[in-house]
Amino acid sequence: MAIHLYKTSTPSTRNGAVDSQVKSNPRKNLIYGQHRCGKGRNARGIITAGHRGGGHKRLYRKIDFRRNEKDISGRIVTIEYDPNRNAYICLIHYGDGEKRYILHPRGAIIGDTIVSGTEVPISMGNALPLTDMPLGTAIHNIEITLGKGGQLARAAGAVAKLIAKEGKSATLRLPSGEVRLISKNCSATVGQVGNVGVNQKILGRAGSKCWLGKRPVVRGVVMNPVDHPHGGGEGRAPIGRKKPTTPWGYPALGRRSRKKKKYSDSFILRRRK
């Protein structure tokens, strides 16, 4: 990832840092239009997720999370930007003529060869079941349910680690720090997701944030009492409570939101940090 630093020619470009290396020219048979409805609203039109709305129109890229082209080698043809995720994607041309997008593994370059199957080398970008991987392997795009496709460790720079295998299950340490059990028959991709420097980007101006579909964030302490529990007071006043709360009065900053009784609790050996 090449970070391009803007010159301070205008206030909006001061200290800006963007990635100017990867472009987007998707294949027409691997994209389709999508209507992003809601913008943070529920079925009643009430805001349930704040600071969302607007943004540039997007085309969805069909990503192959299943990697079910077994024992057929594929070659990386392009590395492209995807507006629907912070990781890059790469176009794969398989030997049987199939063309698919996958998540870009860190370090992969155009011309590299990848393959998926049961008896494939443990090398970057190859996909295989957890039972065929040695302990300590760095992996991403991990299946939870067999055949459903990868659901874990798909963000830019994400990587999990295979730390144990016992019985029918494998123990993984996920990017969040959570340690959980996964069926050994589930598949994963070797290596780390690319674009690890995504957190080094500096948009530099509010307009760039709006293009991404993110609206301005207003602090509750500067609102009126009718709008937020932190609002009101004369001048710059404290929040007036022992602990900060959400606009609806619930505890904020660290409250556990996971259901107390969930079916997957038995698979989690250690909660996330």
From Swiss-Prot:
It comes from the Eukaryota. One of its GO terms (molecular function) is structural constituent of ribosome. Its main location: plastid. Residues 1-23, 224-273 are annotated as: Disordered. GO terms for biological process: mitochondrial translation. The keyword Disulfide bond does not apply. Keywords: Chloroplast, Plastid, Ribonucleoprotein, Ribosomal protein. Belongs to the universal ribosomal protein uL2 family. Part of the 50S ribosomal subunit. This is Large ribosomal subunit protein uL2cz/uL2cy. It comes from Amborella trichopoda.
